[in-house]
């Protein structure tokens, strides 16, 4: 993984979060993970739940999720094999409602109401842009930074002008703001609002309890203690006032997968969408 000029512990944190995002961002991975919520399934049972996958597409996806340690294959007998979440895979699921909450507040309004799963996939696309995590981290810790200074921090071994394509992409995506050419860069409200998502991913990737996200040295808000409330994938929600907390030892949330794939979440009021907000 690429090395930045940030402190070693921060550099390692960014690398872990980038790796975690790479596990779930590939097309259909989140949908397969959600389809596996509940008791382990035979291959044919899982295939019926993700019937939009063409023949031959599911097996390599399952293998990659098994290799990533999110799904386990259990061979009961030669003719009885099941697939289910590993403990690590199940522990990752609570980050998904945090992503939906962020998307509902900050992503631009789509022409049609979007189901939660599409909110998740759109958001993951933004977060996995090249150098996105490192740039967001650097901007969070330094507030306003010039492009040249960001290049020294994020890609010290590369020509400093190489920082501008990913920076321009983050500006286009609405996660970073600047007043124009030669002016410093800073996180937008949407970029800063990623704190709960990135903090929780950091805690998960470090093997910590998810409630440690509130104490993350960069993205944490130790004083923020929102009341716990269940999150249902099919629930219509207005623009949220707060984010659900990271889970600790409680059972994983119940995911109504059919509803998650087919029902839309409520559109945000137009006033909740910042001008130049993140684009889908």
Predicted regions and their residues:
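Recognition helices and adjacent regulatory flanks at domain boundaries
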Residues: 1-15, 43, 49, 62, ...
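Amphipathic alpha-helical dimerization/coiled-coil segments
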Residues: 2, 96-138, 192-280
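N-terminal helix-turn-helix DNA-binding core of bacterial DNA-binding proteins
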Residues: 14-57, 119-159
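Short amphipathic alpha-helical interaction segments
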Residues: 52-67, 156-172
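A short, conserved structural fragment
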Residues: 66-76, 171-181
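Basic, amphipathic "hinge/linker" alpha-helix immediately C-terminal to the N-terminal HTH DNA-binding motif
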Residues: 77-99, 183-198
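Structured N-terminal alpha/beta-domain signature
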Residues: 123, 132-139, 147, 163-166, ...
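Clustered cysteine/histidine zinc-coordinating segments, centered on FYVE zinc fingers that bind PI3P
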Residues: 150-152, 165-168, 217, 231-235
């Amino acid at each position: 993984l690429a090395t930045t000029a940030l402190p070693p512990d921060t550099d390692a944190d960014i690398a872990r979060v980038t790796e975690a995002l790479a596990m779930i961002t590939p097309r259909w991975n989140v949908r397969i993970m959600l389809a596996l919520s509940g008791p382990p399934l035979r291959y044919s049972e899982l295939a019926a739940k993700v019937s939009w996958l063409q023949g031959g597409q599911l097996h390599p996806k399952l293998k990659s999720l098994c290799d990533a340690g999110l799904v386990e294959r259990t061979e009961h007998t030669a003719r009885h094999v099941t697939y289910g979440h590993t403990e690590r895979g199940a522990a990752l699921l609570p980050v998904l409602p945090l992503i939906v909450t962020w998307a509902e507040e900050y992503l631009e309004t789509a022409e049609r109401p979007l189901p939660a799963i599409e909110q998740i996939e759109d958001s993951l696309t933004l977060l996995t842009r090249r150098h996105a995590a490192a740039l967001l981290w650097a901007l969070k810790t330094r507030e306003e930074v010039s492009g040249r200074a960001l290049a020294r921090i994020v890609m010290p071994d590369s020509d400093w002008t190489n920082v501008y394509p990913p920076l321009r992409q983050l500006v286009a995506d609405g996660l970073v703001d600047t007043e124009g050419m030669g002016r410093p860069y800073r996180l937008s409200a949407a970029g800063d609002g990623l704190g709960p998502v990135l903090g929780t991913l950091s805690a998960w990737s470090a093997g910590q309890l998810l409630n440690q996200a509130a104490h993350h040295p960069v993205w944490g808000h130790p004083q923020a203690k929102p009341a716990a409330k269940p999150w249902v994938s099919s629930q219509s929600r207005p623009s949220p006032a707060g984010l659900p907390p990271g889970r600790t030892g409680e059972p994983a949330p119940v995911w109504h997968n059919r509803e998650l794939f087919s029902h839309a979440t409520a559109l945000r009021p137009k006033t909740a969408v910042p001008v130049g907000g993140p684009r889908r």
